[in-house]
């Protein structure tokens, strides 16, 4: 049986063997608090590659040490961190998948016991510290840090990079009027609030020639915040700059109640794709092969990002293939266990 989920997908100069992406998920497992890859990361990502995920995306990886969410985050702020990341990409590639990395700065959500930095001195909540408002020099240094991180990503062997512009972290904080109250060239109008991301993309493009994704929070879930329609304009600008795909998540820029249900964020991938003609990724409570297949067949997204379901079962692609009646070529080491995989779900 043919399956769109298990069809190859080419984006720029990279071809994925199928359309399943391991969504970036923080593991908080850099044990020595130095940003380095550990054996856990090799097993964690390598297992999903062996499980036949098409694109394995490494978790939010900090471009600056002070930009970590926690002191156990992975980092890419120094050349001495390349070696561990290169081992990770090699392990992923050896198991038949492509490798991506999400480049991130936590902004006001950094919880390191030191200063957190943001576009404006507004805390995320009453229980979190007031961040330091970034000056122009700090903004320029952070933009340069993203560029250097992109170059290190290339040296580490990654095929794709994703800029983390969602979930209330630094890029998202500049984009949203809820968190950006600046009166200089980086605040105010949508064009000015986009300037930080624009300059990051321009800077990254100078050193990176592979596909670039951007993860967005397509809804702030606040009456004065951004909606998916605001992100249509942002996405048009990103597309003009050469961004290849928008990974459509939502929320977390401010505390908010979110009604969560199966595929609740697919609507954003569909909307962005329809109104900007850019490739999109759907993410959020996509848990079965038939659900993923339907999203693709309905042309609501181009790639399917799977998060928690891959934590539950790193061999989700095999289960999805069985469900869809698609014969998936398993690793030769596992050929003694052909046929259907049974679950208790």
From Swiss-Prot:
Residues bound to substrate: 28, 164-167
Record lineage: Bacteria, Bacillati, Bacillota, Bacilli, Bacillales
Catalyses which reaction(s): A + NADPH + H(+) = AH2 + NADP(+)
Cofactor: FMN
EC number(s) given by UniProt: 1.6.99.1
Protein residues bound to FMN: 23-26, 60, 102, 215, 307-308
Function: Catalyzes the reduction of the double bond of an array of alpha,beta-unsaturated aldehydes and ketones. It also reduces the nitro group of nitroester and nitroaromatic compounds. It could have a role in detoxification processes.
Subunit structure and binding partners: Homotetramer.
Family: Belongs to the NADH:flavin oxidoreductase/NADH oxidase family. NamA subfamily.
Keyword Flavoprotein: yes
Gene name, Swiss-Prot/TrEMBL: namA
Name recorded for this polypeptide: NADPH dehydrogenase
Gene3D superfamilies assigned to the protein according to its UniProt record, in alphabetical order: Aldolase class I
Enzyme class: oxidoreductase
Domain of life: Bacteria
GO biological process: response to toxic substance
Entry's Gene Ontology molecular function annotations: FMN binding; NADP binding; NADPH dehydrogenase activity
Protein keywords: Detoxification, Flavoprotein, FMN, NADP, Oxidoreductase
InterPro entries assigned to the protein according to its UniProt record, in alphabetical order: Aldolase_TIM (IPR013785), NADPH_DH_bac (IPR023663), OxRdtase_FMN_N (IPR001155), YqjM-like (IPR044152)
């Amino acid at each position: 049986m043919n399956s769109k989920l298990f069809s190859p997908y080419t984006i720029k100069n990279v071809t994925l063997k199928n359309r399943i992406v391991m969504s970036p998920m923080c593991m908080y497992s850099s044990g020595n608090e130095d940003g380095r890859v550990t054996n856990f990361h090799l097993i964690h990502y390598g297992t999903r590659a062996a499980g036949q995920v098409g694109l394995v995306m490494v978790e939010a990886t900090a471009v600056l040490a002070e930009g970590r969410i926690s002191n156990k985050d992975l980092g890419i702020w120094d050349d001495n961190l390349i070696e561990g990341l290169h081992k990770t990409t090699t392990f992923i590639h050896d198991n038949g998948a492509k490798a991506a990395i999400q480049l991130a700065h936590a902004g006001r959500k950094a919880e390191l016991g030191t200063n957190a930095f943001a576009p404006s001195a507004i805390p995320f909540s009453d229980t979190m510290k007031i961040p330091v408002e970034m000056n122009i020099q700090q903004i320029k240094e952070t933009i340069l840090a993203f560029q250097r991180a992109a170059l290190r990503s290339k040296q580490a062997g990654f095929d794709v990079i994703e800029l983390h512009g969602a979930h209330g972290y630094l890029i998202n904080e500049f984009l949203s009027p809820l968190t950006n109250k600046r009166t200089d060239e980086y605040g105010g109008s949508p064009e000015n609030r986009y300037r930080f991301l624009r300059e990051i993309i321009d800077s990254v493009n100078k050193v990176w020639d592979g596909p670039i994704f951007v993860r967005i929070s397509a809804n702030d879930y606040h009456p004065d915040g951004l909606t998916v329609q605001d992100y249509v304009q942002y996405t048009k600008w990103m597309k003009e700059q050469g961004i290849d795909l928008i990974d459509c998540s939502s929320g977390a820029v401010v505390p908010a109640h979110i009604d969560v249900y199966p595929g609740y964020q697919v609507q954003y991938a569909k909307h962005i794709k329809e109104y900007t003609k850019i490739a999109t990724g759907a993410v959020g409570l996509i848990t079965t092969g038939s659900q993923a297949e339907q999203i693709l067949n309905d042309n609501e997204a181009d790639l399917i990002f799977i998060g928690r379901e891959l934590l539950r079962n790193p061999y989700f692609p095999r289960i999805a293939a069985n469900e869809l009646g698609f014969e998936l070529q398993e690793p030769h080491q596992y050929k003694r266990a052909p046929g259907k995989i049974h679950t208790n779900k």
